[in-house]
Amino acid sequence: MPETLARARAILKSTFGYDDFRPGQGEVIEAALRGDDLLAVMPTGSGKSMCYQLPALVDGALTVVVSPLIALMRDQVHQMRAVGVAAATLNSTSTEDEVTDAWTLLRAGELRLLFVSPERLLTNGLAGHLKQAGARRLAIDEAHCVSQWGHDFRPEYRDIARARAALGDVQTLAFTATADRATRDDVVERLFPRRPQVFVHSFDRPNITLRFAPKDQPRRQLSQFIERYRRESGIVYCSSRKRTEALAETLTRHGLRALPYHAGLDQGTRARNQDRFLQEDGIVVVATVAFGMGINKPDVRFVCHADMPTNVESYYQEIGRAGRDGLPADTLTLFGFDDMALRRRQIDEKDIPDERRRVERQKLEAMIGLCEAPTCRRQALLAYFGEESGPCGHCDLCAGAVPVVDATVDAQKVLSAVARTGERFGAGYIADLVAGRENPAIQRNGHTALKTFGAGRDKPHGAWRALIRQLFAAGAVSETDGEYPGLRLTEKGEAILFGRESIALRPEAPRKASRDQRRREAGSAVEGLDPSDEALFQHLRALRASIAREEGVAAFIVFPDRTLIDMARLKPIDLGAMRAVSGVGERKLAAYGARFAQAVGDFLAR
């Protein structure tokens, strides 16, 4: 093992309390210690930040970290200072005291990590000052933001190359969790003065269970799902502020501790709700998709989407906020015909270049394809990022597999109804017509006399709604323009209607609970802990929450769940035994070790 990597491993243990690197970290850290420029594509929760933190501690030189996420920068500064590392942040919300503190450390040559927003890096000659202070390394987080092909393009990231030039010939490290090949190539071209090493690790997050469900009383579906995780933290994403507040109220009425979070709330309310989410267990935040960007909370146990995401990258990034501690986490995504139609209209109405519109449409179609995947969800998700895998065995489809069947005849009934009604009516109307529902509109329009009226009485109404949604996803029908869009046949739809093509679809069926879900419902909420150890784990969580409130920090900055679980297993009652717990470094041992050892001893003495 190279000497510098051995030193990094020693610091990993003494400072952070971990015995070894996470999978994939070692090779990236080794390249960084050699001085190589690099781009690392690593899944959320794999420990990307450690790949620039450790090199800064090994060589003692200043590392400048660029991030668009102010909350994440603040959290990382708190985390670094909690383990004795000199770190600071400069961004648009920095207080006068924070700015003074950063410059004091910088001038004294003591600063190891400076977190800055991309726009701040070019303000008031900051890059030049950092060059004079001996900045040796530039680390760029969320590097996909520089690419026009990425799902989260930010124009200010285009200026990072200019800032890097002002810093001098510094080593450049770029990190992202979501970048397909086109995005990676764009990042390399725009951020690096020379060809970097590129590390692309698996996108798989095997600790996260993937579930999708067609919308059917979505508030009830979400409440029932979240009820299983009453003592755990989670995030529910909604597409609008109004839906966010309404759903938070619904969950609260069901006895859950739900808080809304969106840009329309005043800053004080947002800050209070975010602090409760970070400091307490069992809080559910119902939010617009902006929430969670930069929320460095490793013990989020579930993420729900009340509405279908716009693209696979956003979906992957948002579910990636669950289970960052490597422990089991769950997800649920609800989707429906209205979601698909709305997302398509939003793209069509955007004032963007045609090439960008084409890319966004392709990304949306991939998201719709994931919702309607006929086989393993994880396999389909990884395939989108160019990664081959076998069936995972525990997503919703693997756990309750429903075979794909030839649906051509049923599709023809729907398509015929669309054609015979003049392509003027929406999905609900067509489903009523085929199912034989004599609603007033159908009677008024004389459509009870059509051959297709009641042609599908042998199936429930919901089955026809589901079939129409899948036909829409498959591109057999689209929507007409106008205030009240109706369904119309596409070329593919006409080919199916007239028998030139067939179509296979997956019938709707209730999903069976996965093995992991049944285990959770039957016993311990933490995989691998027996009930008595879980009681100790919850006791330690309560102590952690108390300390977090005392210090005004996020609970995981005291200790993450993974460390508390190890404590519950090992049951250390003195500082010597506490040293063996994963995640307890020397600084935290001194700060918290005695209180937690006392708590373990008191619990065991009961």
Describe the function of each predicted region:
Residues E355-F385:
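Short, charged low-complexity linear segments at domain edges
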Residues M1-A8, V359-R361, E388-R606:
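Accessory DNA-binding and partner-docking regions appended to nucleic-acid-acting proteins
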Residues G168, R230, P374, E423, ...:
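Flexible coil/turn residues that form the inter-helical turn or adjacent wing/linker of helix-turn-helix
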Residues P2, A6-T15, D19-P23, E27-S49, ...:
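Helicase motor core with emphasis on the C-terminal RecA-like subdomain
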